[in-house]
Amino acid sequence: MLESPWHPLLSQPATEAAIALLGCWLVRRFADGRVIRGRIVETEAYEAGDPACHGYRRQTARNRSMFGPPGQVYVYQIYGRYHCINLATEAADLASAVLIRALEFPDTEAIAGAGPGRLCRFLAIDRQLDGSWLGPTSPLDLEAADYPLGTLIQTTRIGLTRGVDLPWRWYLAESPAVSRRDRRAEAEQMGVSV
């Protein structure tokens, strides 16, 4: 079985890995030699036992990669047109993953990576990459954070009908690429009045 070099970081529960991934760079390598890097600025966690988790009820052909060992890529499609990239976490055979919600791309408008559908479109990530591995010879990899993160905001996830009250979304307050800000959480966590 393959193992991602990022296995140690991703062997944590999704709620811990989601925080640890902030500031890291998601690297996309293309067959023509191009490489695009985006700094991870927003994540959401999904764990076994969470009613919003795709693997909450059972493993299926569609969500199989979510049950993969830490570092396996889980890509799914929503609304029949947008793709979302997740990284399997914690342990094999356990439904646990981190959704990459937003990336900040150097020298590119913030809107390009503001949301899972946009960042996947910008990086040409689709179901063909589902089940792949993070690593130096893979189309997808991570690089360590290389500068201070700034202010970390914790709040609830977006667009759910179940598990809506779980505060399992994190983002870097200073990033212009955050998909949706929670001004109340920012005020509370940064000590500023609304």
Curated annotation (Swiss-Prot):
Coiled coil: none annotated. CDD domains: AAG (cd00540). One of its GO terms (biological process) is base-excision repair. Its EC number is 3.2.2.-. The keyword DNA repair applies. Pfam families: Pur_DNA_glyco. Keywords: DNA damage, DNA repair, Hydrolase. One of its GO terms (molecular function) is DNA binding. Belongs to the DNA glycosylase MPG family. PANTHER family: DNA-3-METHYLADENINE GLYCOSYLASE (PTHR10429:SF0). This is Putative 3-methyladenine DNA glycosylase.
